Amino acid sequence: MDKISSIRGMPDVFESDTNYLAELNETLSRIFLSHNLNEVNTPILEQTELFIRSTGVTSDIVNKEIYSFNDRNEQSLSLRPEGTAGVVRSIIQKKLDTAEHKLWYQGPMFRYERPQKGRFRQFNQAGVELLGFEEGSSDLEIISIVCDIFIELELENSVLRINHLGDKDTKEKFLSELLKYLKTYKGELSDNDKEKLNKNPLRLLDSKDGDLKDFLDKGPKIIDFLSSEQLNLLDKIQSVFGKYVEIELDSSLVRGLDYYTGLVFEAVSSNLGAQDSFLGGGRYCLLYTSPSPRDLST
């Protein structure tokens, strides 16, 4: 009989690391409680359709990384790859989506990725969801929480990158110009990038292909299509919080999930090597229209 060992990318965690994780969770929970957030726990298993409809059919999570299987009733279930979709599903299912909610959670997530330094197939993740609040005030509060994390954990050599993806009209105008620009480069795209071009061209903006990246750097920028109100939000974030953490405006930042609209952000550290991102998020109004007909700013 072959020796039984742990699944690749799913490490055992012993005392030194469990103590560190306990301290980290205690610090994060203290920060979240100081912002009057309430803890929520959702199941590790969800219907696969939830993640297809929320993260997007073109997302890497759905196409490459999700752990799915059929149960005895031939229902497709998945280990959660992220926490947001389950929280939103819970709020809608319990008919709580007509009120405002400030929630936080933490727990194990699962993604079928190539294990490497800083990236595992089972990993712990903490998250914050501000549900039902209008754009602007909640965006500033979420950045305030991020800054508190930077300060409390004394994060060094770290930068907070921000961008704004605009609203539906902004995206449509920008995508129209982007597609015109990309026509001259279409023949140079890889098969994978051609698929992104056909299904979700915004995904090309965070391409790691050097030649494509250089080409896109000279093309249209979404920031040029933003309203004065949207630009003012980015300016306010930089002016209010820039004194506490280093903030960069990154027009290529789109994040990896289809449900983001409006503000997006990502924290990176030069201490982490190639996998330098350790925190990220953004506004996701469209996620509420995926599992539910209700429209709720989130």
Ranges and model annotations:
Residues 297-298:
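N-terminal low-complexity segments that are often proline-rich with Ser/Thr-Pro
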Residues 1-17:
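Auxiliary tRNA-acceptor-end handling modules of aminoacyl-tRNA synthetases
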Residues 4, 51-55, 260-262:
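Short secondary-structure transition/capping segments
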Residues 163-176:
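Short, conserved secondary-structure transition motifs
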Residues 54-58, 175-176, 263-266:
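Short low-complexity, flexible loop/linker segments enriched in glycine and/or proline
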Residues 40, 44-77:
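Polyanion/phosphate-binding surface patch
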Residues 17-37, 46-47, 64, 74, ...:
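Positively charged, Gly/Ser-enriched RNA/tRNA-binding surfaces
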Residues 64-71, 177-196:
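Acidic, His- and aromatic-enriched active-site or binding-groove loops in soluble protein domains
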